[in-house]
Amino acid sequence: MGKPVEGATFAVEGFGNVGTFVTKFLTEAGAKLLAVSDSKGCIYLKEGIDYPKLMEVKEKTGSIINYPAAKTEPGSNIIHANVDILITAAIPDLVKTGDVNSIKAKLIVEGSNIPMTEQVEILLHKKNILVVPDFVANAGGVISSYVEYIGGDEKKMFKLVEEKIKKNTEIVLDSAKKNKTHP
């Protein structure tokens, strides 16, 4: 993407375990959440969505769609958000071939399992949209389970997840660049 996380805009598809943690992490790093979805729909706010307030709304009402002042849309619209980064964190087969030309994000991180086919990933690659594959990006659950198994605490878990995913992402992206292929 060539842009630092601080100041980048992002959207998160799915606001469960993966979605809430990635939102917390990115907002703490200085990124700006513009859109988020859950099973009830998608919200968009160009001024940005406040993470603590979003968590409060979800805990009190059961859904992110009750966030005040946000524009509410069908959940599937999340992939068309005008953001730098799109995080998929819920459903499989989210991005279809017909969606490719309307995607505005320059980086897609597959936090969910199989959010698109390899054919879609190739089409996105041809549009210079970087896709971090699901087998790299959503390994956090396995790493977390390992840390729990060895008796580690939450701090150790987050540190190890960050280290391993960052390292593995760099390896996959460097290999793709070297071999002139998509990750």
Where are these regions (language model features)?
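Glycine-rich phosphate/diphosphate-binding loop of Rossmann-like nucleotide-binding domains
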Residues: 1-80
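Short, surface-exposed connector motifs at secondary-structure boundaries
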Residues: 4-7, 81-82, 100-107, 127-128, ...
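Structural motif
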Residues: 9, 31-35, 62, 84-85, ...
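Glycine-rich nucleotide phosphate-binding loop and flanking beta-alpha elements
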Residues: 19, 93-94, 115-116
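Rossmann-fold NAD(P) dinucleotide-binding segment
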Residues: 73-83, 91-108
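Short glycine-/small-residue-rich Rossmann-like dinucleotide-binding loops
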Residues: 87-91, 113
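Adenosine-phosphate binding glycine-rich loop
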Residues: 106-183
